Amino acid sequence: MEVPNVKDFQWKRLAPLPSRRVYCSLLETGGQVYAIGGCDDNGVPMDCFEVYSPEADQWTALPRLPTARAGVAVTALGKRIMVIGGVGTNQLPLKVVEMYNIDEGKWKKRSMLREAAMGISVTAKDYRVYAAGGMGLDLRPHNHLQHYDMLKDMWVSLAPMPTPRYAATSFLRGSKIYVLGGRQSKYAVNAFEVFDIETRSWTKFPNIPYKRAFSSFVTLDNHLYSLGGLRQGRLYRQPKFLRTMDVFDMEQGGWLKMERSFFLKKRRADFVAGSLSGRVIVAGGLGNQPTVLETAEAFHPGKNKWEILPAMPTPRCACSSIVVKNCLLAVGGVNQGLSDAVEALCVSDS
């Protein structure tokens, strides 16, 4: 596949969110984008639920979440949207699970989690939902792995994760669930573990080379990219924004040696990232400057280098993001105050 030139990328301003927010969860199903919950200007979790139509460039309000929440884990099972855990209006983790039927336009309560949790990582395969980790009411990270059986409306415990954590990144590849990074209390974890759905067992993979918070993970072809982030301050060490890029080769099963010339051009953390048309994209976030970053970059795997893209129209950090129809959407987030901006980085003709 031919990788597009940086000149082929452009930002489009889309219809803004109906209200400003941060920590909302996004989901694409049936070509539509759903925005679920989030926090308002006062940091209070919201019960808003809207759908965005790319064709009409329009947000439509849907029946509100029965339980207001932010940072909720979401997944689609056919024509149903499942929302799991998150933070409630009392600022505590939730055990509530709710399901929205797209055809009926109605919410239903489902079987609760065994323990309240926020920062759960969710993947779905064959109408089964897998929920890994999370942080409980006692603020301790969980090592739970549970699967939800939709036909029986039941959660079943599976083999626990070797490393307890919350806010990890997880993705499905074949019959394996890859779980990367995350946190224990305030501190970043560099564990990389894989659960085999068929054998129901965990395998520890080589740790992520650099431990950092607010980094991003992106998969492209047979590679997994670990990008940027914040090296946290401890004792005598100052916090430091990073431009590090680590690449894991999924065929070889190891981290590749990276030259400094392959690193990001800008140090950044808490940014938008994704893969578009054979390139890895990063945009916005926080860096060494006093204001939010507006810069965007694209990695060319053939040239092993980052190239400058057009700047974000509304610079932001802490955005929600999703890739839809060859566009990377940046939704809400923070620029001084909260933002309602929705912008898409698209490849020409998409």
From Swiss-Prot:
Q: Entry's PANTHER family?
A: KELCH DOMAIN-CONTAINING PROTEIN 8A (PTHR46260:SF1), RING-TYPE DOMAIN-CONTAINING PROTEIN (PTHR46260)
InterPro entries the record matches: Gal_Oxase/kelch_b-propeller (IPR011043), Kelch-typ_b-propeller (IPR015915), Kelch_1 (IPR006652), Kelch_domain_containing_8 (IPR051746)
Determine the domain of life of the protein's source.
Answer: Eukaryota
Q: What is this protein called?
A: Kelch domain-containing protein 8A
Q: Which organism is it from?
A: Homo sapiens (Human)
Q: Which controlled-vocabulary keywords does the entry list?
A: Kelch repeat, Repeat
The record's listing under Pfam families reads: Kelch_1 (PF01344), Kelch_KLHDC2_KLHL20_DRC7 (PF24681)
Asked if the Swiss-Prot or TrEMBL record annotates the protein with the keyword Repeat, the reply is yes
Matching Gene3D superfamilies: Kelch-type beta propeller (2.120.10.80)
Kelch repeat segments: 1-31, 32-79, 81-127, 128-175, 176-222, 224-278, 279-326
